[in-house]
């Protein structure tokens, strides 16, 4: 039996990594083949106690402080989208979960061009820049809070409130004390 492959594309901060890792653990227990992408910052948060392929994405936020930094960051993002395109072309998952953050952006854009289904998850009260840009292209938007700001009304049909994705260690904290 061929395992379905799930790719989780996440930003590099703890607010992105920990929900992504919890999701990876959940799908691994359900016997899916799970891969996770993040940037160099995210690697320091991850312990690989799962059968999980972790791929480092070299990307950048779009820096608008001066024209020189803007041009450099723009080209880094374009190169990252191209690299993500070829990665997905040869490692095609069944679905992608975009967890927000600038390092999830290139994977989700490449997925759109390759017609790979992807959903996004937003765990803040205000939608992040990467997720906001991806709204027209994703299949669904999973949110922690129904009161999420920044989603235009014409995308409300895509929104599904699921709450916060919480690590198992936190859920089981009182059970083990």
Question: Which role does the model predict for each range below?
Answer:
Residues 22-25, 29, 109, 113, ...:
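Short, well-ordered alpha-helices that flank and scaffold nucleotide-derived cofactor binding pockets
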Residues 2, 33, 41, 112-175:
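Active-site-proximal region of nucleotide-activated glycan assembly enzymes
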Residues 3-11, 29-76, 160-166:
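Conserved nucleotide-sugar phosphate-binding/catalytic loop shared by glycosyltransferases and other
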Residues 41-45, 84, 93-114:
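An aromatic- and histidine-rich active-site surface loop
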Residues 7-9, 97, 119, 142:
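Structural motif
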Residues 2-4, 29-33, 79-85, 94, ...:
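Catalytic machinery of carbohydrate-active enzymes
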Residues 66-95, 113:
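An amphipathic, basic-hydrophobic alpha-helix
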Residues 8-21:
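A short, glycine/small-residue-rich beta-strand->loop->alpha-helix junction that serves as a flexible
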């Amino acid at each position: 039996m061929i395992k379905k492959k799930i790719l989780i594309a996440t930003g590099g901060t703890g607010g992105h990594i920990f929900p992504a890792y919890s999701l990876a653990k959940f799908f691994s227990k359900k016997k899916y083949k799970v891969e996770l992408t993040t940037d160099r910052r995210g690697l320091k948060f991850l312990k690989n106690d799962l059968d999980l392929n972790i791929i480092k994405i070299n990307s950048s936020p779009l820096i608008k402080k001066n024209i020189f930094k803007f041009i450099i960051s723009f080209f880094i993002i374009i190169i990252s989208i191209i690299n993500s395109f070829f990665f997905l072309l040869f490692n095609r998952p069944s679905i992608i979960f975009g967890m927000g953050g600038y390092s999830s952006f290139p994977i989700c854009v490449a997925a759109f061009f390759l017609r790979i289904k992807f959903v996004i998850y937003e765990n803040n009260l205000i939608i992040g820049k990467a997720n906001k840009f991806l709204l027209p292209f994703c299949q669904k938007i999973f949110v922690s809070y129904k009161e999420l700001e920044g989603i235009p009304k014409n995308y409300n049909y895509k929104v599904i409130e699921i709450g916060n994705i919480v690590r198992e260690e936190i859920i089981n904290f009182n059970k083990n004390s």
